[in-house]
Amino acid sequence: RKPAAPARPVLVHGDYRTGNYLADESGVTAILDWEGAHLGDPVEDLGWVCVKSWRFGAVDKPAGGFGSRQELWTAYERAGGGRVDPARAHWWEVFGTVRWGVICHQQAWRHLSGSVRSMELASIGRRAVETEVDLLQLLKETA
């Protein structure tokens, strides 16, 4: 069930994941691709960065392949973001997984329909099945 609207909507990036960070030896220097920014739930970006597709093989580190969910939430809270409700964060991770699965199907269709012939789109499209498995695992955790 979708959580209630947040008491205080905040600026949400909308695509907060490792592919949209710039970093150097000092750490993250910029966050890119703000076209999906909107006012919303403070936990939405935290759920999106935990979608399994952004771990790039580091499945034991669900927070973008860098750490645990708890480490992410603790850092968020220490930075002034407020307390993270784990159930709310889980809902947004499930939502993000569904969202990514839909995007994978859309990218595959763009390639297969001939509207945009692209190996990149074809390879993203094949990830739809992985996302379906990820979703089943997340839903099992919820049950």
Where are these regions (language model features)?
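Active-site catalytic-loop/activation-segment of kinase and kinase-like phosphoryl-transfer enzymes
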Residues: R1-K2, G67-E71, A128
